[in-house]
């Protein structure tokens, strides 16, 4: 990571970070701006009450510049060890290629290990080949499974 980021914090995100997190996610999904703020706040309140969900973030002078969500899922297979799903991985366009994504995903993987998970999974859009190369570089295997998605209305 570059030395110019001495003010960077890597930590669990809180309600105080929500507005900045929404701004960051608008880079990933422009429809974030159309979402009902009351629904977002209600969802965030639910997330904060659930110790199996954590938003990991890189925060530079109060601005969330990289984030991901990790969800620990109880499981009855694999000797009843849980698994971890990582979703919503994004780094601010102005902060990319500086190791921040690796750090926030690393935080999520540490949470998974602390929780006794037997694996960590994430999905990525089929056309995001740059992201795929990044995930493989940091230890994920894109050739072992095939993800399926069903969008619900």
Short names for language-model regions:
Residues 91, 97-110, 137:
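Conserved acetyl-CoA-binding loop-helix of GNAT-fold acetyltransferases
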Residues 8-21:
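A short beta-loop-alpha structural element at the N-terminal edge
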Residues 121-131, 149-153:
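Conserved beta-strand-loop-alpha-helix junction that forms the acyl-donor binding cleft
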Residues 45-57, 85:
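A short helix-loop-beta-strand connector motif used in the catalytic cores of GNAT acetyltransferases and
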Residues 57, 63-72, 90:
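Conserved beta-strand in the GNAT
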Residues 8, 62-67, 84:
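Glycine-rich phosphate/pyrophosphate-binding loop shared by adenosine-nucleotide-utilizing enzymes
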Residues 22-45:
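Conserved GNAT-fold acetyl-CoA-binding loop/helix
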């Amino acid at each position: 990571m570059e030395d110019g980021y001495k003010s960077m914090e890597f930590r669990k995100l809180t309600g105080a970070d929500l507005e900045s997190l929404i701004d960051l996610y608008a880079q990933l999904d422009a429809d974030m701006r159309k979402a009902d703020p009351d629904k977002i706040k209600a969802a965030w309140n639910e997330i904060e009450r659930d110790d199996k969900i954590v938003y990991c973030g890189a925060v530079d002078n109060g601005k969330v510049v990289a984030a991901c969500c990790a969800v620990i899922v109880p499981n009855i297979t694999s000797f009843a060890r849980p698994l971890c799903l990582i979703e919503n991985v994004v780094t601010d366009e102005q902060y990319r290629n500086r190791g921040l994504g690796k750090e926030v995903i690393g935080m999520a993987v540490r949470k998974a290990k602390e929780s006794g998970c037997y694996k960590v999974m994430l999905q990525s859009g089929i056309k995001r080949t740059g992201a795929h190369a990044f995930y493989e570089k940091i230890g994920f295997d894109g050739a072992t499974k095939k993800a399926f998605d069903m969008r619900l209305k």
